Amino acid sequence: MTRPIWMGDEPPPDRPPTLAGRGRLALRGGAMALVLMAGLTLHLAVRLIERPLHGGHRPWTPAITPVVCRICVAILGLRYSVRGRPMQHIGAVVANHTGWLDIFTLNACQRLYFVSKDEVADWPFIGWLARATGTVFIRRDPREAKAQQALLEDRIRDGHHLLFFPEGTSTDGLQVLPFKTTLFAAFYTHGLDKVMQIQPVTVNYTAPEGEDPRFYGWWRDMPFATHLAKVLSVARQGAAEVVFHPPLDVSDFPSRKDLAAACEAAVRSGMGQRSR
């Protein structure tokens, strides 16, 4: 897998799973794979009926993903909590990005559609899963900028809560990188700023007892398979907390840079403030 890389500090050294760890890896990994495949099969079956009747509106299939992700979080054994409430208004969500685990922790508590770099569509299994669940893929090509802008606008007006990671990469989970403002421009076209809100969200992870505080972070050139195996094989998981901040009216901010700065400040304010 290739992805924009944040270098940060040197990651903790990899440790091969113990014999017991391999057993946990097999049990958790196998169970999660079965749940994901069952959820994807159900999603595709429902979509076959939903698409002819509703087109891009997707009134039924978004309810499947949170259930699947909640089951996966439970299988993983991650202690999971939520503060605040997901917004109901038309709009988008922005969050800090720690790694692949965000897919489960963020989807488990609300109906979302991820906005991702186009190369993710080619990743084994994950790309297939992302396409099936309505992920919006963005290509770094100026010639396609207008078409992609129109796609984002259409999805938002259809009531889809699109999830952006404005840091542009994943981190060690202990900090928030400066937000890139480019994608915020999508919220200022064709009067969209007059009708939509942005909800900043902070995802906090607590490492398992005795592990490096950056345990759940995925950065530098860490291999996906190695990191996945490390998380699945640990004896006792840590915790994840999703913090929903008050939604922001886009119309209150004169420019994308002002809006991005306000969202970044909100996300930063929730870092490390885990409830007990």
From Swiss-Prot:
SUPFAM superfamilies according to UniProt: Glycerol-3-phosphate (1)-acyltransferase
Topology versus the membrane, per the UniProt entry? Single-pass membrane protein
EC number(s) on file: 2.3.1.270, 2.3.1.n4
Question: Which GO terms of the cellular component aspect does the record hold?
Answer: membrane
**InterPro entries reported in the protein's UniProt record:** Plipid/glycerol_acylTrfase
Q: Does the keyword Zinc-finger apply?
A: no
The region annotated as signal peptide is: none
Q: What is its main location?
A: membrane
Pathway assignment: Lipid metabolism; Phospholipid metabolism
Biological processes per GO annotation: phosphatidic acid biosynthetic process
> In a knockout, what does one observe?
Mutant lacking this gene is unable to produce ornithine lipids.
Name its cellular compartments.
Answer: Membrane
* GO MF, one annotated term: 1-acylglycerol-3-phosphate O-acyltransferase activity
Per its UniProt record, what Pfam families does this chain match? Answer: Acyltransferase
Role description: Catalyzes the second step in the formation of ornithine lipids, which are phosphorus-free membrane lipids. Uses acyl-acyl carrier protein (acyl-AcpP) as an acyl donor and converts lyso-ornithine lipid (LOL) into ornithine lipid (OL). It can also act as an alternate acyl-sn-glycerol-3-phosphate acyltransferase (AGPAT) to ensure glycerophospholipid production.
Q: What is this protein called?
A: Lyso-ornithine lipid O-acyltransferase
Which source organism? Rhodobacter capsulatus (strain ATCC BAA-309 / NBRC 16581 / SB1003)
Its lineage opens with: Bacteria, Pseudomonadati, Pseudomonadota, Alphaproteobacteria, Rhodobacterales
- Supply the gene name: olsA
